[in-house]
């Protein structure tokens, strides 16, 4: 905060300090001052030894107003038997042992040794084995359960219970063949196989060899498929080309009875429209096929 009232006093005091901000320390005196004692408790510091004056005179200035009650008591030498407890009425005598107050115990007079109950030492229940006595057992007796093993039955008891459960199961009577003959045959198709449902085979489910991944990655299956397509196309084209080649051969080129028989088979395979032409003799067919200039 700026104090404007002191700005006009001069350039050196332009920014005067605020009185409320901090306290200006008092100027220190240049006189020698004795160092304070290391401890104010008597016997723990050399304050009494350093002075040459009489001890009672020096102890007079040990106690200060700023000292606490405990420090003042310690400087005076303390109180004798400060931590001892004196029973009421015996304060002037010798100190006695600490006695319990009346409010600390439940009864005013503690029981004597003869009145105290003798505690019986007993083992825990899970460490004591007691034989079962049916005479002493009541109707509400229940055997104790073990801490770990919860199966209280023997092997023979368990087998007997399982046999009883199997006997109690509901069993249907056996089917007699006499009743089946009296009831007659059920209505329906005679062929039992016809009544079964049959589904067509799903495409793609063939019992083939497992997939070869190296062949799959290198497009080997693709090449096989293309080769199969080419073979199928070539098989479709071969009968047409063989038939055309047989028909294009002339009787002069035919050698032997095999070629003649092949020509007759090719002519017979033609449709009914070509029957009149096929009825002609080989000489007429040859003359018809030759041009007029060569005749």
UniProtKB/Swiss-Prot annotation:
Pfam families documented for this protein: DUF5524 (PF17662)
Transmembrane region(s): none
InterPro entries attached to this UniProt entry: DUF5524 (IPR040247)
Domain of life: Eukaryota
Record has Phosphoprotein as a keyword: yes
Biased composition (Low complexity): 277-289
Biased composition (Acidic residues): 267-276
Keyword Phosphoprotein found: yes
Ranges where the record places region Disordered: 33-52, 180-295
Compositional bias segments (type: Polar residues): 205-217, 241-251
Annotated keywords: Phosphoprotein
PTM annotation (Phosphoserine): residues: 50
Name assigned to this protein: Uncharacterized protein C7orf57
Gene: C7orf57
């Amino acid at each position: 905060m700026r104090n404007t009232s002191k700005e006009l006093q001069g350039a050196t005091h332009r920014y005067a300090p605020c009185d409320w901000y901090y306290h200006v320390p008092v100027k220190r005196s240049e006189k020698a001052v004795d160092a304070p004692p290391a401890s104010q408790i008597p016997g723990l510091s050399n304050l009494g030894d350093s002075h040459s004056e009489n001890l009672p005179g020096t102890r007079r200035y040990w106690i200060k107003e700023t000292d606490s009650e405990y420090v003042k008591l310690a400087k005076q030498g303390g109180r004798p038997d400060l931590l001892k407890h004196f029973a009421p009425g015996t304060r002037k005598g010798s100190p006695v042992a600490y006695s319990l107050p009346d409010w600390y115990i439940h009864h005013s007079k503690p029981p004597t040794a003869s009145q105290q109950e003798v505690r019986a030492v007993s083992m825990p229940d899970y460490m004591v084995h007691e034989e079962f006595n049916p005479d002493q057992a009541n109707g509400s007796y229940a055997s104790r359960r073990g801490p770990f093993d919860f199966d209280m039955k023997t092997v023979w008891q368990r087998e007997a219970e399982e046999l009883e459960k199997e006997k109690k199961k509901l069993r249907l009577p056996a089917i007699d063949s006499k009743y089946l003959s009296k009831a007659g045959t059920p209505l329906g198709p005679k062929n039992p196989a016809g009544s079964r449902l049959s589904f067509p085979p799903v495409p793609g489910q063939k019992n083939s060899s497992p997939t070869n991944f190296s062949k799959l990655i290198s497009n080997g299956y693709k090449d096989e498929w293309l080769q199969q397509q080419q073979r199928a196309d070539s098989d479709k084209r071969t009968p047409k080309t063989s038939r055309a080649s047989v028909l294009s051969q002339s009787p002069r080129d035919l050698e032997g009875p095999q070629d003649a028989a092949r020509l007759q088979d090719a002519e017979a395979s033609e449709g009914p429209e070509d029957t009149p032409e096929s009825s002609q003799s080989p000489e007429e067919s040859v003359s018809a096929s030759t041009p007029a200039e060569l005749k």
